[in-house]
Amino acid sequence: MGFQRDFNTKFFPLTEPLIPDAESRIMSLRDGKKKMSKSDESDFSRINLTDDPDLISQKIKKAKTDSAPIPKNLKELDKRPEALNLIQIYSSINKLEIEKVLNEFGGKNFSEFKNKLGDSLIESICPIGKKIKEYLNDSQYLEKVLIDGSQKASEIATKNLEEIYDIVGLKKFTWNSVFNLYNIYKC
């Protein structure tokens, strides 16, 4: 913001989140008040992108819930963080409003819901995990991606620096101009 203000420019746009708030913070499968984290000791607190279908299903079935049936409305979810967490995950992965999920599953027990949630996660996550494993087993492809990415980043950075030099009022130095100055002023 300081650069924008000091040089009266909008060169560095403010970033906008790509993930909606409700989906940006997924809670632990073991504790609905804690964020899901790969640093958690228990592998059953999270779904990893490389988990196989059986493991995803097992983790969801063991996810912490209370003994009460699934709530029928949002207000009933207020004091049930584990239920809210699983319902939000299902809602996000299936692109449904939470109210629609509650209309479908409200009053039912969690076992049926967990089966549906597990199936949805398997359908969404397993293709990603398969691709990750393919990429990790193809070192030549990964090396090419790294080299291509480095070249693209360098091109973008060079272009950005040129624009920043213009905005700030600095003269752009090239190696040729540096060598010319050296040759002119060498002692």
Where are these regions (language model features)?
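Conserved nucleotide- and phosphate/pyrophosphate-binding catalytic cores
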Residues: 1-187
